[in-house]
């Protein structure tokens, strides 16, 4: 190019070449603007879910988001991540909470109802005892406090507060509530009992009642399964002043003597001499005496001197036999 031409045309032809047209034309710009508007709608929907349109956010995404040459990246709305343990997350509301409510709440209500019913029937039982002549308030309170249904088989629990002797296995029975209250009242005679011996633990019910009247209760059972059962029955009550022994009740417990009171829950032809000797001066022994097939009488024996006892024959009763040895 000559100097004159250069002055007239300062730019060369190659300088006038335009850059290649970018893919974004007017249509692309319009699409980008539309995408931005959609993003604003999505952001507004996320910020105010209660007022959001029922249209799913995915339907607001640009149709050509993945097309080549769009040039403007469009952020897709964030989706909630699935739980890491979907099985647990799905089952938790149904099996964890609902089943828990079904198993826990009714059981608590049922336990409360049973406890309330037990207390009410015990009170009615105590009223019957009072009407039949039991007057010692300590004995009545003890009979009211000890749950007799815990000492019988579940199938007999409905009869626990009836005035009836019930079988406890091994040809043994739990004495009638009226007999238990009568024997304990006779043994106490209004005194403060320090040490009491029971012959024939059985299921442990009478020992539990005695534990609320005396400071220390010693109880002997000759039938090993009943001895073990009594321990299990007494364990939930957490009675601290009962000492159970497996042995021959006719021998007594010389090591723990003398006793303020002795209660024998089985009938013999007479009262064993060993037990009379273990009774403290001024102490009282209550026992059924008589033949198994004949008449049995509830007998009170009082020790009035080292070698003198006074006997009183009271009520007709019926008990299982008093036997020697252990099984």
Curated annotation (Swiss-Prot):
<feature type="compositionally biased region" description="Basic and acidic residues">
    <location>
        <begin position="14"/>
        <end position="29"/>
    </location>
</feature>
<dbReference type="InterPro" id="IPR029063">
    <property type="entry name" value="SAM-dependent_MTases_sf"/>
</dbReference>
<feature type="compositionally biased region" description="Polar residues">
    <location>
        <begin position="92"/>
        <end position="105"/>
    </location>
</feature>
<dbReference type="GO" id="GO:0032259">
    <property type="term" value="P:methylation"/>
</dbReference>
<keyword id="KW-0808">Transferase</keyword>
<dbReference type="GO" id="GO:0036211">
    <property type="term" value="P:protein modification process"/>
</dbReference>
<dbReference type="GO" id="GO:0004719">
    <property type="term" value="F:protein-L-isoaspartate (D-aspartate) O-methyltransferase activity"/>
</dbReference>
<keyword id="KW-0963">Cytoplasm</keyword>
<dbReference type="GO" id="GO:0005737">
    <property type="term" value="C:cytoplasm"/>
</dbReference>
<keyword id="KW-0489">Methyltransferase</keyword>
<dbReference type="GO" id="GO:0030091">
    <property type="term" value="P:protein repair"/>
</dbReference>
<dbReference type="InterPro" id="IPR000682">
    <property type="entry name" value="PCMT"/>
</dbReference>
<feature type="region of interest" description="Disordered">
    <location>
        <begin position="62"/>
        <end position="105"/>
    </location>
</feature>
<protein>
    <recommendedName>
        <fullName>Protein-L-isoaspartate O-methyltransferase</fullName>
        <ecNumber>2.1.1.77</ecNumber>
    </recommendedName>
</protein>
<comment type="function">
    <text>Catalyzes the methyl esterification of L-isoaspartyl residues in peptides and proteins that result from spontaneous decomposition of normal L-aspartyl and L-asparaginyl residues. It plays a role in the repair and/or degradation of damaged proteins.</text>
</comment>
<dbReference type="Pfam" id="PF01135">
    <property type="entry name" value="PCMT"/>
</dbReference>
<feature type="compositionally biased region" description="Low complexity">
    <location>
        <begin position="62"/>
        <end position="77"/>
    </location>
</feature>
<feature type="region of interest" description="Disordered">
    <location>
        <begin position="1"/>
        <end position="38"/>
    </location>
</feature>
<keyword id="KW-0949">S-adenosyl-L-methionine</keyword>
<comment type="similarity">
    <text>Belongs to the methyltransferase superfamily. L-isoaspartyl/D-aspartyl protein methyltransferase family.</text>
</comment>
<feature type="active site">
    <location>
        <position position="175"/>
    </location>
</feature>
């Amino acid at each position: 190019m000559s100097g004159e031409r250069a002055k007239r045309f300062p730019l060369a032809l190659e300088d006038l070449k335009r850059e290649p047209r970018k893919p974004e034309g007017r249509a692309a710009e319009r699409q980008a603007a539309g995408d931005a508007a959609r993003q604003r709608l999505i952001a507004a929907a996320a910020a105010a879910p209660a007022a959001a349109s029922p249209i799913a956010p995915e339907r607001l995404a640009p149709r050509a988001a993945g097309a080549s040459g769009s040039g403007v990246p469009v952020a897709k709305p964030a989706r909630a991540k699935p739980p890491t343990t979907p099985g647990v997350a799905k089952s938790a509301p149904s099996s964890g909470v609902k089943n828990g409510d079904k198993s826990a709440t009714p059981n608590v209500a049922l336990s409360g109802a049973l406890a309330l019913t037990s207390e009410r029937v015990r009170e009615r039982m105590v009223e019957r005892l009072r009407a039949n002549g039991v007057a010692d308030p300590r004995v009545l309170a003890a009979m009211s406090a000890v749950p007799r249904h815990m000492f019988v088989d579940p199938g007999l629990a409905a009869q626990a507060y009836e005035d009836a002797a019930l079988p406890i296995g091994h040809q043994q029975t739990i004495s009638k509530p009226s007999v238990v209250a009568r024997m304990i009242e006779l043994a106490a005679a209004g005194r403060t009992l320090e040490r009491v011996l029971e012959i024939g633990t059985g299921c442990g019910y009478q020992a539990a009642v005695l534990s609320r009247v005396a400071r220390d209760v010693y109880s002997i059972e000759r039938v090993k399964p009943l001895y073990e059962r009594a321990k299990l029955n007494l364990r939930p009550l957490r009675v601290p002043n009962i000492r159970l022994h497996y042995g021959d009740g006719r021998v007594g417990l010389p090591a723990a003597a003398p006793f303020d009171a002795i209660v024998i829950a089985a009938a013999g032809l007479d009262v064993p001499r060993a037990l009379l000797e273990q009774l403290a001066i001024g102490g009282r022994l209550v026992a059924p005496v008589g033949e198994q097939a004949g008449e049995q009488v509830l007998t009170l024996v009082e020790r009035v001197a080292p070698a003198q006892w006074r006997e009183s024959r009271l009520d007709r009763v019926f008990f299982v036999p008093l036997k020697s040895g252990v099984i």
